[in-house]
A protein has these predicted regions:
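A general structural motif
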Residues: 1, 80, 108, 135-137, ...
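Mid-to-C-terminal alpha-helical segments outside catalytic/metal-binding sites
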Residues: 1-42, 68-76, 97-101, 188, ...
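Hydrophobic faces of well-ordered beta-strands that scaffold small-molecule active sites
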Residues: 4-8, 43-45, 82-86, 111-113, ...
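Active-site environment of divalent metal-dependent phosphoester hydrolases
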Residues: 11-14, 51-53, 90-92, 119, ...
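Short, basic, glycine/proline-bearing loop/turn elements
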Residues: 15-20, 114-115, 231-238
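Active-site gating/metal-coordination segments in enzymes
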Residues: 47-180
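H/E-rich (His + Asp/Glu) clusters that bind or coordinate divalent metals
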Residues: 155-175, 189-306
């Protein structure tokens, strides 16, 4: 069965001296070897917007260098590697122009964007970025960055990683929904890392809040009145399978359906065997057609990969 891993991360080898990142994040040959061993046909490689060192993933120089690297990676390994552009569109027109270059000139397959930047969430992204994405029929891969909102309170037990990142995704997606961005842009395709954090778990609670938006004792709501319950917009999201267990994955399946679940491993950097990640999908007891969609067909459609 055709398998596409839609969630893996690599960096340029020239960046090794600038940080303390896992060695396999600089080793495409190791990625290809794991791919072959597990029967994965294609890996979608992206920037995680995480860097432990002296590089800032939000700068324009970082984006340009990464995008050039991604284009070379895709060119050197056709069919086996598909690469996404990186962009930090909150930081202005220069960054949106770089995303345009990455799609039009470099031929990258989509755009990876963090779930927040410098305390701003997804709804604060300039409209020009969404217009570019829609005009190019591109998919945006949403991945929490290394410095999420509230990071300073999560300095023990790597809580920034295990709680902070999925929380950042959850809050950012909720704001995107409630501010009406998905209602206004119904053709927007978003693939959310880690099954969208906890967005599937709180979708009904978003509906509760929206239904009681005019109930004064609970306090003020907001300016936007959606035409449908928030959960209807959550159901439009595409979610990857990086959940590290079957329970959340089943919840995601129930919320968006097999047609919007996309296999991913987060390897590298996560040093779990690809077979383990594939096992989470197998545990869902899907039909053969649904399994084929989740493991490969959905990703190929999202990123226009043959």
């Amino acid at each position: 069965m055709d398998v596409v891993d839609a969630h893996s991360h690599l960096f340029p080898a020239a960046w090794v001296p600038h940080g303390r990142m896992p060695a396999d994040m600089f080793d495409v040959e190791a990625l290809l070897a794991r791919q072959e061993e597990a029967g994965v046909a294609t890996s979608v490689v992206s920037d995680p917007h995480i860097w432990y060192g002296d590089l800032d993933p939000g700068t324009i120089d970082y984006a340009r260098e990464y995008n050039n690297f991604a284009a070379e990676l895709q060119r050197d390994h056709p069919n086996r590697v598909v690469a996404l552009a990186t962009a930090t569109p909150w930081r202005g027109q220069e960054h949106i122009a770089e995303a345009e270059r990455a799609l039009d000139e470099l031929g990258l397959a989509g755009i990876a964007v963090a779930t927040s930047d410098q305390g701003q969430y997804l709804e604060a992204i300039p409209e020009a970025f969404w217009e570019l994405v829609l005009d190019r029929d591109a998919t945006v891969f949403l991945h929490p960055g290394g410095t999420v909102v509230g990071q300073e309170l999560m300095d023990m037990y790597r809580l920034g990683e295990v709680c902070g990142r999925p929380l950042d995704t959850t809050v950012s997606l909720a704001r995107l929904v409630l501010h009406g961005v998905l209602e206004r842009l119904p053709r927007l395709r978003l693939l959310c890392a880690h099954a969208g954090g906890a967005i599937c778990a709180i979708a009904d609670r978003l509906d509760f809040g929206h239904e009681l938006r005019d109930y004064a004792p609970l306090g003020p709501w907001g300016a936007v009145n959606l035409s449908e319950p928030p959960s209807a917009y959550v159901a439009r999201l595409h979610l990857d399978t990086v959940t590290y267990g079957a329970a959340l994955l089943r919840l995601a399946l129930n919320r968006v359906g097999a047609s919007q679940l996309v296999f991913g491993s987060d390897n590298p950097p996560v040093p779990f065997p690809l077979r383990r990640s594939l096992g989470y999908v197998e545990a869902l007891d899907l039909t053969e057609g649904e399994t084929a969609a989740v493991l490969g067909r959905n990703a190929r459609a999202l990123f226009h990969v043959r």
